[in-house]
A protein has these predicted regions:
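Conserved kinase catalytic-core helix
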Residues: 36-49, 88-114, 158
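ATP-binding glycine-rich loop module of kinase domains
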Residues: 11-35, 85
Length: 234
């Protein structure tokens, strides 16, 4: 059966079958998967303890689930599944650092992460591990990080709210799985808190930029046309 948490990605889905954890990769995701596999990206990330292990298996295991099926992966079953709204401050911070460390390592090999959702991280004991192989895609020169706002909403902003105001974001997370938008967080912070470089650069500036973009009627096509050098990206 399909895992209820993997419904968003058109490139692949997670399934549970006969005690196995399987990942179906469809037409839309097979090129990026093959590029990362052939560049040995997955194996290096697994060896560093960043990424959950994987192995290709017979597509006949999932015969008939979708005509676009191209590859089937099997993953080890994690002993425990948790969610960001259940994590402690240190757990959320550790998951955020894993995400950044993995992303920097991928960029060094000309790959990147297509998103930055906290739900792509699980824990083995106290160690965070990345679980979404299909969000690892080839880096395109000049590309902006599509997951920047998502990283802020699901990692940085909840941590800032926790650190600056002493308010745990767990209940907020349960009500909005996308996390805390910069536009909302700015309303909760005082002027002294907004004056810190981290908050000014990653909350206030993002909030202003987003509001300006909405008011100007900017669309996704306009934003993706902008270019950013790799050193600036990093």
């Amino acid at each position: 059966m399909f895992d209820s948490g993997s419904f968003r990605d058109p490139s692949g889905r997670i399934l549970r079958q006969d005690g196995k954890i399987l990942r179906a990769i469809f037409d839309q995701g097979v090129a990026n998967y093959a590029a990362a596999r052939d560049a040995d990206i997955y194996r290096r990330a697994v060896s560093r303890g960043r990424l959950v292990d994987l192995r290709e298996t017979d597509t006949s295991l999932l015969a008939g689930i979708d005509p676009a099926l191209r590859v089937v992966l099997e993953h080890p079953r994690l002993p425990f599944i948790s969610y960001p709204y259940e994590w402690t401050f240190s757990g959320l911070k550790t998951a955020a650092l894993l995400h950044l460390d993995l992303h920097l390592e991928l960029l060094a090999d000309d790959f990147t992460l297509s998103d930055a959702t906290a739900y792509n991280v699980q824990f083995e004991g106290t160690q965070p591990i990345f679980i979404d192989h299909l969000s690892i895609v080839p880096y395109e020169d000049g590309a902006l990080w599509a997951g920047q706002r998502q990283f802020a909403m699901q990692f940085l902003n909840p941590l800032i709210l926790w650190a600056k105001r002493g308010v745990a974001p767990n209940t907020w997370y349960r009500g909005n799985v996308e996390g805390i938008a910069p536009e909302d967080l700015t309303k909760l912070l005082g002027w002294r808190e907004k004056a810190s470089f981290t908050v000014l650069a990653h909350v206030v500036a993002q909030s202003w930029t987003y509001k300006r973009g909405v008011q100007a009627g900017l669309n996704a096509k306009t934003n993706t046309a902008r270019k950013l050098s790799k050193p600036a990206f990093i």
